[in-house]
A protein has these predicted regions:
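Structural core of flavin- and non-heme-iron oxidoreductases
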Residues: 1-479
Length: 479
């Protein structure tokens, strides 16, 4: 998939190699001419952060403590220097790497960029080929007399889906759109399996239970749901962060004005002061723990979570992320045949799932203990005080209970996986739905196992692969 990654990326945070690649020298594995621009925080912001005595002490002490615990610190430091702290550089993909890194940003000119900007860019260039319909809720796939997918039925109207925080009581206007060639579903890990089931594709038993005519008995639809785990270790600093002066995290505040006019300052970053990757166990092939330090109170995503950014200016949060999770027992099932009703989503976290050895839970507990070790000197000198998990969670069992009660995830995937139909697969290697002509799925639901630390780049890569597959097949059929 490296080829697809290079095709979509436009890397701006390795200027030396960006220059040398013009002469055929490029060991980094980055892409340079794609649509997804990647940058790192401005140099002046890094200098300002190090001008904050508390920030400098935190970064210096925790970095030294991390290096002291490395099995081979000289080799790791050499690799860090070779890649300049870039976590996505090809040399870092050596299977024995663990170390400190910076967190690249998907920004262009200090403005966030993603699939939204890509779609608008393509629509601007090819308005005759791409039409974007807002306030439209897909309700089912349409089929012709031969059973080939030929379109999508949808409801037109705002806030129709009852997952909305303020759903409308209206039912919407029923509409249809027809496909000349194929239908491609990109609804994500929750809505793609729901839409397939509403269209008669899924577990026959479940479909009949809701009065839906069975078109294809495909039990893998909505199964294999996965996510990674994330949990927070939070400290209270001795005083407010200097770097947060003037930041009210709202449009028009002094920090926003600086970003708006000069594209500088705190709002030109994601807020991560320090990050590292490591293994939760020495015998696993790839690092599976990513931790980053944020000068903020952050304990997950929930309605109003960002209010804590305004409320506290003296917090340090270590966000602990467990990747390559072992639990694939999550499910997406229908609550009813009503397309306005969200599906029932159950990840079956930890012991509820199929990670019977408790490897994910143990990895998170060990990571919290590791964060505590890194910050112990700062506790002893009075720079910070632990807020969470706190003094009531000192033992491994108490930390395990803290993780069970507070872990979250926001990279749901794998609910319509690529694979053999007999093994629970929903789509084949060309993203075509088993047992159906003219229907494909291209989104986060198609992964058999959740990839990497952060899902979005992997989704972009499979989208590039799917585009290549579709174009190849279209050319083959036209000859």
């Amino acid at each position: 998939m490296r080829r697809h990654a290079r095709k979509l990326e436009a890397c701006h945070h390795r200027p030396f190699w960006r220059f040398l690649r013009r002469f055929g020298v490029d060991p980094t594995g980055h892409g340079w001419d794609g649509w997804l621009h990647t940058e790192r925080p401005p140099k002046e912001l890094e200098a300002e952060a190090l001008g904050d005595a508390a920030m400098l002490q935190m970064i210096g002490v925790t970095s030294a403590e991390f290096a002291r615990r490395l099995k081979n610190p000289l080799a790791t430091i050499f690799r860090w220097a070779h890649s300049a702290g870039d976590p996505n550089s090809r040399p870092w993909r050596s299977r024995d790497f663990e170390g400190l890194c910076y967190t690249p940003l998907s920004t262009c000119g200090r403005r966030r960029i993603g699939s939204r900007e890509r779609l608008l860019q393509v629509r601007g260039k090819h308005a005759d080929r791409l039409h974007i319909e807002c306030n439209a809720l897909a309700t089912r796939v349409l089929f012709d007399a031969e059973g080939t997918a030929c379109g999508v039925e949808y409801l037109k109207g705002a806030r129709l889906y009852r997952a909305h925080a303020n759903p409308s009581a209206a039912r919407g206007e029923r509409c249809e759109v027809r496909a000349r060639r194929e239908v491609i579903l990109c609804g994500g890990a929750f809505n793609t399996p729901q839409l397939l089931m509403l269209s008669g594709i899924g577990s026959a038993e479940q479909l009949r239970r809701h009065g839906i005519e069975v078109r294809v008995d495909l039990p893998g639809v909505g199964r294999n749901l996965q996510d990674r785990y994330e949990v927070a270790v939070t400290y209270r600093m001795r005083g407010p962060w200097k770097i947060l002066e003037g930041a009210r995290f709202e449009r028009g505040d002094p920090v926003w004005q600086r970003w708006h006019r000069q594209k500088e300052g705190l709002y030109a970053s994601n807020g991560a002061a320090l990050a590292f990757v490591r293994r939760s166990a020495p015998n696993i092939p790839d690092p599976d723990i990513f931790c980053m330090a944020l000068p903020a109170q952050f304990d997950g995503y929930y309605p109003g979570f960002s209010a804590n950014l305004k409320k506290y200016d003296d917090r340090l949060t270590w966000a602990v992320l467990k990747a390559h999770t072992h639990n694939n027992a999550g499910t997406v099932t229908l609550k009813s045949a009503d397309p306005l009703e969200p599906p029932r989503i159950d990840f079956h976290y930890f012991e509820e799932g199929d990670d019977t050895q408790g490897r994910d839970l143990k990895a998170l507990v060990d990571a919290i203990q590791f964060i505590r070790e890194l910050n112990r000197p700062l506790l002893h000198c009075g720079l910070l005080t632990e807020e969470a998990p706190g003094p009531d969670a000192l033992t491994a069992p108490a930390l395990a209970e803290y993780v069970r009660n507070n872990a979250w995830g926001h990279h749901a995937s794998c609910s319509c996986p690529i694979g053999l139909r007999a093994n629970g697969g929903v789509v084949d290697s060309s993203f075509a739905v088993h047992g159906v002509r003219g229907l494909r799925v291209v989104d986060a639901s198609v992964f058999p196992r959740i990839p990497g630390f952060f899902l979005v780049s992997a989704v972009y890569m499979i989208a590039e692969k799917a585009a290549e597959t579709l174009l190849h097949e279209a050319r083959r059929k036209s000859t």
